[in-house]
Amino acid sequence: MDKIKVGLQYWIPQHGLTRLVGKLASAKAGSLTTAIIRWFIKQYNVNMDEAKHADPKHYKTFNEFFVRELKEGARPIAEGDAIITHPADACVSQFGPITNGQLIQAKGHDFSAQELLGGDAALAEEFKDGSFATLYLSPRDYHRVHMPCDGTLRQMIYVPGDLFSVNPLTAENVPNLFARNERVVCIFDTEFGPMAQVLVGATIVGSIEQVWAGTITPPRGNTVYKWDYPASGNHAVILKKGEEMGRFKLGSTVINLFAKDAIRFDESMANGQPTVMGTPYAHQQ
């Protein structure tokens, strides 16, 4: 059955299905929208007690519900300049060293930092012998993505690609998954060197948005696009630890890359471990 589930993903019209679901999720359908949201909450055991607006009737579209805001104070940010915090509510898929330019996707499957970063060899070199972590956001999770540390945006890269599911089953069976799916790469300069925060698209992920640029995808294309940002001035993008930096409609995966000897992961990190945005993730070396 697992092989069938994975195999079907090669045959379904990934982009067409994603466009359709995106349109439906953005539709204002009144009581039908409310009914779908109620079903989703029950089906995935979504904790609405922490949502700023707990009543499903508040949300005019499914997407509004999916990127729901939390109550103030629901995610306190761990203090301390040396503490790097989890960027999202998620589950640790894999983490560890970047070895020979390779990151672990799942047992028996690796992928390259250079491919993940859109084929930019010079950029990948900045993370040579560094560290990475892959975080999977499930349907029930809070789907806004935050900064794990203070950072100044240097570059944003849109990399077109497939839209396979990114759930654990697919990660274990589709080679090069995260380097073949559509993604938005954000490169930040921090006090401890460069840091990449990569938002990976997936089947029925209708859009990836950034707080400084709005919706990056759709529209979708076949060309890698790059945007460079100044370190200071009116057009600089400077974000503090814990600030929102992006969001998924619907959910997906976040991958962080850190430079060599820049960080050590927190002792709480383990594959399969649930994460809570704002809690300790790693520490500056």
Swiss-Prot record:
Keyword Cell wall biogenesis/degradation: no
GO biological process, one term: phosphatidylethanolamine biosynthetic process
EC number: 4.1.1.65
Any one of the GO CC terms: plasma membrane
Pfam name, any one: PS_Dcarbxylase
Site for Cleavage (non-hydrolytic), residues: 251-252
Annotated gene: psd
Keywords: Cell membrane, Decarboxylase, Lipid biosynthesis, Lipid metabolism, Lyase, Membrane, Phospholipid biosynthesis, Phospholipid metabolism, Pyruvate, Zymogen
UniProt-listed PANTHER family: PHOSPHATIDYLSERINE DECARBOXYLASE, PHOSPHATIDYLSERINE DECARBOXYLASE PROENZYME, MITOCHONDRIAL
Coiled coil: none
Membrane topology: Peripheral membrane protein
Protein name: Phosphatidylserine decarboxylase proenzyme
Cofactor details (free text): Binds 1 pyruvoyl group covalently per subunit.
Function of the protein: Catalyzes the formation of phosphatidylethanolamine (PtdEtn) from phosphatidylserine (PtdSer).
Cofactor needs: pyruvate
